[in-house]
Regions:
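N-terminal pre-Walker A segment at the start of P-loop NTPase domains
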Residues: 1-13
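Hydrophobic anchor at the beta1->P-loop junction of P-loop NTPases
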Residues: 24
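P-loop (Walker A) phosphate-binding loop of NTP-binding proteins
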Residues: 27
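Conserved lysine of the Walker
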Residues: 32-33
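Conserved nucleotide-sensing/catalytic segment adjacent to the nucleotide-binding pocket
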Residues: 56-102
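Sensor-1/coupling segment of RecA-like P-loop NTPase cores
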Residues: 94-114, 257
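Short regulatory helix/loop adjacent to the ATP-binding pocket of P-loop NTPases
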Residues: 109-124, 135-140
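Interdomain hinge/linker elements that couple catalytic modules in large macromolecular machines
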Residues: 136-265
Length: 265
């Protein structure tokens, strides 16, 4: 499958011209690594099982050794080796060069790093693909053009039917779901992501066992209330109507989903 350009490509390029390193965060499967590899000239993947043990040993004992390689150098899922953060920060300070490193991560769980990276490591958030990025929207309406030329808007028509839009909403903007498969297979990507997030990731993020059914109920309630004026109390009431869950436990689950970058309020 050919690479589909992302709106964030230009954002990353500009940040690489201004900072020594850039951290890209976003939920699993939204395309962070693929996008980063378009601009990286070498990379380390900490979840590559063939190399993982060796990489982590070096990262824990002499992390600067992993910085050797063509630049920009990508560190995928860097949070598995948090000492790499300090090594990158120091190298950026010492060299004074911009565009040296890209880091990607699928969680915002607190990392024990001695330095925040401010003014050395810039951050950017990535999301699943928009309909324009997936080439389903014709892009005739541009918010930028409307602001720059408010009188230039003319009537236009979407190439998508109502059924197309409903399907796209259920499928989501996950790049893996855009490969040449049947519609049921495309929907299966979103279903599997939802299931694994609620049954595995929500507990693994901070090693706290959580109830998969409660997690699913909370996310379903969030989905129902997106783009509404519903507050946290309304969603909590919706959840507790079917789950015997306390307010404190509810917010614990919300915190877990925020760490996984699934919820972004």
């Amino acid at each position: 499958m050919d690479y589909l350009k992302r709106i964030a490509d230009e954002q990353l390029r500009l940040k690489m011209e201004a900072f020594g390193a850039v951290l890209i965060t976003g939920p699993k499967g939204c395309g962070k690594t693929t996008k980063a590899k378009q601009q990286a000239k070498s990379y380390i993947e900490f979840q590559d099982e063939d190399e993982r043990e060796n990489y982590l040993l070096i990262a824990n004992t002499h992390p600067s050794d992993l910085l050797k390689g063509l630049k920009p150098r990508l560190f995928d899922e860097w949070q598995d080796a948090p000492k790499i953060w300090g090594a990158i920060r120091k190298d950026v300070d010492d060299s004074g060069e911009v565009g040296q490193y890209i880091l990607t991560g699928s969680s915002s769980a607190g990392m024990d790093t001695p330095h925040t990276g401010t003014l050395r490591i810039s951050r950017m958030q990535m999301y699943p693909m928009s309909l324009y990025e997936s080439k389903e929207s014709n892009g005739e309406v541009s918010l930028l053009r409307l602001f720059e030329h408010p009188d230039s808007f003319t009537t236009c028509k979407s190439d998508m039917s109502i059924d197309d839009i409903k399907f796209a909403i259920c499928r989501g903007g996950w790049p893996a779901s855009l490969r040449g498969r049947a519609d049921k297979a495309k929907l299966a990507i979103a279903k599997d992501l939802f299931g694994q997030t609620c049954s595995i990731d929500i507990s693994k993020i901070d090693n706290v066992k959580r109830n998969a059914n409660w997690a699913k109920t909370i996310l379903k309630s969030y989905a129902r209330n997106l783009c509404t004026l519903a507050d946290a109390k309304t969603i909590l009431a919706d959840v507790t109507a079917t789950c015997d869950i306390s307010k404190q436990t509810y917010y614990d689950y919300i915190n877990g989903f925020e760490k996984l970058l699934i919820i972004d309020d």
